[in-house]
């Protein structure tokens, strides 16, 4: 029986732009990437990254894979949105300020009963959500 999500990988159109977005917002530590200057004979070990990066986001991993030329659409089969957990409402307030500071449009904080959500999109239009419980 499964006990949690190990990792999620998002396909993106531009790895540099996506890295700047996710690292600028979340400052997650990089868990796995091919080191700069890796000799060609050793690069095959990193083939599973497909030129991307994997971040440690707490108890799970989130990867970015630069292969897509399509745009995200939650109305097609596949991913609807990615929701990331925060500890409480104060972190959500800080997130609003950070999104505003970086000029990232968002839907404002919404009360959904058991907590609050903040919805926004990444540069590839992937729907993202931050969730904060009412009681930390």
Functional labels for PLM-detected ranges:
Residues 5-14, 53-56, 71-136:
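Vicinal oxygen chelate
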Residues 11-60:
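Core segments of cupin and vicinal oxygen chelate
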Residues 12-22, 81, 107, 117, ...:
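Secondary-structure boundary/capping motif
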Residues 21-24, 95-99:
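Short amphipathic alpha-helices in soluble, non-transmembrane regions
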Residues 36, 67-68, 133:
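Residue-level structural signal for beta-strand termini and adjacent loop
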Residues 63-66, 128-129:
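Conserved beta-strand in the GNAT
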């Amino acid at each position: 029986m499964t006990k949690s999500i190990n990792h999620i990988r998002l396909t993106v159109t531009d790895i540099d732009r996506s890295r700047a977005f996710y690292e600028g917002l979340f400052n997650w530590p990089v868990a796995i990437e091919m080191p700069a200057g890796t000799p060609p004979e050793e690069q095959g070990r990193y083939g599973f990254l497909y030129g991307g990066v994997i971040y440690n986001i707490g108890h799970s991993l989130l990867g970015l894979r630069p292969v897509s030329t399509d745009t995200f659409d939650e109305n097609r089969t596949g991913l609807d949105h990615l929701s990331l957990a925060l500890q409480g409402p104060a972190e959500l307030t800080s997130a609003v300020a950070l999104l505003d500071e970086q000029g990232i449009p968002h839907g404002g904080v919404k009360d959904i009963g058991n907590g609050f959500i903040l919805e926004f999109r990444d540069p590839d239009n992937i729907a993202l959500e931050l969730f904060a419980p009412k009681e930390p």
